[in-house]
Amino acid sequence: MVRLRPVLTIGFPAAAFATNCYVIAAAAGEECVVVDPGIGVEDRVRDVLREHRLRPAAVLLTHGHLDHVYAVTPVCDGRTAAYIHTDDRYRLVDPLATIEPGMLAMMEQQFGQRAVWREPEDVVELAGNQSLDLAGLPLRVLHAPGHTEGSVMFALPDVPEGVTGAQVTSTVLSGDVLFAGSIGRTDLPGGDARAMQASLRDVVLPLPDATLVLPGHGPATTMDRERGTNPYLQGLGA
């Protein structure tokens, strides 16, 4: 079953690192997807699910950094699969080992306890440009390496694919690939500045101007705004 763009999109930042977590569904009372459950968001996710009578069909991860995946196991709760690109799958084994020591120390100081990681039980590995139908939502996986090897964006089309003239993307969950006025870092382990440039040129810039961008950090934006004002997109060409 393929639906039009979702009508229920709830986003909120985690207390740590202000990582945006999103809950997306076609409507209240239906299945949903949870995107990037970061540090300490599990209770907030449960509240959203209860308030809107939602049932999680999948947990989608834009990449494997700790601030985007830390609550994936409690949110999945042994009943829901976590989806991550195959190139970032190794990070779910122990994301604590793939981050800067300073980031880990900052997190432990903020929460006053040692970070503990549990790998999710059911993990589905994604490929680039893969199509998914989860919670009745048509999703496209856009592989956009640079911030990490397996960074992806999740695109939701405005109308179902297969309809004439329907290859228009209305909403993109951009993770740490694209922010309002900026892009994700490439100096962390697994980052690659050249790969990021290629992703921006070949994956991000072709998105239609009307695309709503829901980033991993900071406010929502549009491709029209970013194309005109984001300094990291200037000079790359369409």
What are the residue ranges of the model-derived segments?
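Conserved beta-strand hairpin/beta-sheet module of binuclear metal-dependent hydrolase folds
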Residues: 2-52, 154-166, 170-173
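Short Pro/Gly-enriched beta-strand edge/turn motifs at strand-loop
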Residues: 2-8, 110-114, 135-139
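Short Gly/Pro-enriched turn/cap motifs at secondary-structure boundaries
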Residues: 12-14, 121-123, 143-145
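Short acidic/glycine-enriched loop/turn segments that link adjacent beta-strands
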Residues: 16-18, 126, 148-150
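Conserved S/T- and glycine-rich ATP-binding loop of Class I adenylate-forming
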Residues: 24, 62, 144
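Metallo-beta-lactamase
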Residues: 30, 40, 98-102, 137-237
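Hydrophobic residues in well-ordered beta-strands that form the structural core
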Residues: 35, 83-84, 174, 215
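Active-site HxH/HxHxD metal-binding segment of metal-dependent hydrolases
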Residues: 39-43, 47-133, 159-162, 228-236
